[in-house]
Amino acid sequence: MQQIQSFMYRIQKLDGRNRLGNWFRCCIVVKYQWDTSRVRPAGSSLKTFGGRASGPEPLVDLFKFTVRLFNGAAGRKLTPLECHDLCCKIAQIVVVGGVRRSALISLSDLQDDDIRQAKHGAWYNTEPQRGLANNSACYTSKPSFNLFSNEWSSLHESQSGERGIFSRAASQKQAARNGRRDSERDFGTNPCSEIILRPNQFCNLSEVVVRPEDTLNSLRRKVRVATILGTLQATLTDFRYLRNIWKTNTEEESLLGVSLTGILDNPLLTLDNPNLGSLLEKLRNEAIETNKLWSERLGIPQSTAITCVKPSGTVSQLVDSASGIHGRYAPYYIRRVRADVRDPLCKVLEDAGVPCEIDNLSPSTKVFSFPKKAPEAAVFASEQTGMEQLQLWAVYQEHWCEHKPSITVYYRDSDFLEIGNWVYNNFDTISGISFLPYDNHTYAQAPYEQITKKEYNEMMKGFPESFDWDLNESDDFTEGSQTLACVGGACEL
């Protein structure tokens, strides 16, 4: 006899994510109806979190998806793919004014065919929520050549660059190198795969922006400042909604994530420098000694792992640098940015004449296209082979990172097999790498798209020279919303 109680659960006015979490827990354990009439309407200002409310529609969408999924699994356990889809759907609805405030990585068993095939074919039409997760196969040891070959072929066939590689064994090996960390853990990683994490643990990121004119001394100073910021952030462990294990793990390891972005903008930090390894070790030691000093001052444990390279997709746009360890995308390219149709800024951009279109995955979101020209002396991803990207990754893994360098290796059919051979031969050191075809991938409205100089000039002819910001909202809704990277559910992907 079914003993699941059916009842009306009335949702009160929303002011925090904690209530949303509690209500969704009720969704998982009971059969219910819901009334969202008292949820604040779409477009309302969020004074604490910042931005604009998305209204009740995303929450209702999640509830309906969950009920449909559970009804389809009546009498049995959910499959790994169904659990994956549910997590993706949760991530999909965590939005503020059309801007996602979630990031997700899904680590799956090597031999799980369902998740291996999750982004094959026209998945973006039938299962669009899957676009919210980075999918990686989780390896506990080096696989046989046959197993690896099957997975490598599947990655190529998907044209989505998935699944990526996450090796728990290599992560344990990397964690053990500095002698400060308990490496016998079932490590995972954060969504961008630059931080080695225990279960129930956070990353804590800060960043050095590398400029072309930087010297060893100026880089040392920047690393020192970024490390101080990270060490101060490591004291912030009052996670009121989460279980105590999150606080315990975070305080025990006091992890940092001191990153470098704009690496390829400075010749000192590229493979052109024959002393690159020793330079990176000097910078790493600067971070370690700075953290040791400030940890003592603050009365917290010395960090068990400090340095990494994060992808830095957002920060690099803000400061006009190359992204993390990657080259600039191309000499000329389109950079796409999303905005909710109810956001006043969306109307400002649209009225000014910035090219835009409806988001294929969200009718309430518009995608704006900005033509971009890279600096003359820039290193371009379009000019790098996959092997060149991997060789640079290996140097930073060895000489800079106590965590990992996050990298998306862009490949072409001409070097795909060579890359696979290198990956297999170096598998014991590869804690996590993702791959993506440079072109012909399955992602519509991708963030970056290479264009020709002629296409760039054509786009610039109709592009507005300036914006009338006086047309924008006059009230300040950003107070209290200054969320740091990867804190409070916001990951700057």
Regions found by a protein language model. Name each.
Residues 29-34, 73-85, 94-106, 234-248, ...:
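Flexible, glycine/charged-enriched surface loops at secondary-structure junctions
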Residues 1-214:
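Active-site cavity-forming subdomains of large catalytic enzyme subunits
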Residues 98-142, 237-243, 262-311:
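Internal maturation/activation junctions in enzymes
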Residues 1-9, 44-52, 67-77, 206-216, ...:
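Glycine- and acidic
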Residues 55-58, 82, 184, 194-201, ...:
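Secondary-structure capping and boundary motifs in well-ordered enzyme cores
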